[in-house]
Amino acid sequence: MSSRAELKQKAKNLLDGRKGKAALMVLVYSIMPFLFTLIPLVGPIANAIIFPVLTYGLLKTFINLKNGEEIGVFDFFSNGFKDFGKAWGVSIRVVLKLWAPLLLGIVGCSVMISCVFIAMSSGNIDFSSSTIGLIIGWVMVMIATIWSIPITWKYIYAVNELAYDSSRTAIDIVNTSGKYMVGNRWNAFVLDFSFIGWFFLVGITFGILGFWVIPYMLVTKILFYEEISGRTENTAVEELETIKTEE
C-alpha cells in the first residue's frame, strides 16, 4: 500500500501537462448548478436531479484521464448521462445505508425547532424547559453526526466502484465498495483530511485555486481506491471473486 505522500506524488505526475484541461473541466462543472438555477421554476428541481449524475460523470472522466486517455472538457456530461439510472441508484442506496443517523438527526432538529417555536408563540417563555429541549435536540444531532461518519466513509467510494463496472446492480456495487473499505476507512478519512490545508487556500483565493486542487484530490482518491480494490495490479476481478466466495 502506497503512503499518502506517494499517492499524491503519483497524482501530480499523472496531471502533469494536463492540469489546464482538468481545471477547465472543473470550472465548467462548477458553474452548472448556477446555470440551472437561472431556469424559472424547474431550474432548482433539474439541478437536484442532474447534479449527482454530473458528479459521477466528473469522477468517471478523471478515471479516464488517470488511465492516460484523451479527455474533453465536456466529457463529464456524456460519461454521467450514460449511466444516469445507475448513478442515481447507487446514490439512493448509499443514502439508505445512512437512514438511521439521518432519521435521528431530523428528529433532533425537529425537537430544537419545536422548542424555539413553542417558546416564541407562548409569550411566557419558560427558559428551563426550552433549554432542556434544545440540549436534548442538540445531543441527538451530535450523536447522529458522529454515527454517520464511519458509515459515510464505508461507502464513500461506491461511485468509484460504479465507474469501474456499471453492469452490476446498484446494491452489489455499494456493498462491494463497502467490503473493500473494511480496514481502510481510517486511511480514507485521513487522506481526505490531509487536503484541509489546500482548501483553506481555496477559501483565501475565493475558490479559484479549487479548479486545480479538486483534480489533484480526485486523482489521489482514485489511486487510493484502486490500490485497496486491487485494480492497481489489475487484480480487481480476482479480488472481487474472492469477496463473493467469502460471502
Residue ranges and their predicted role:
Residues M1-E247:
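Hydrophobic alpha-helical membrane segments
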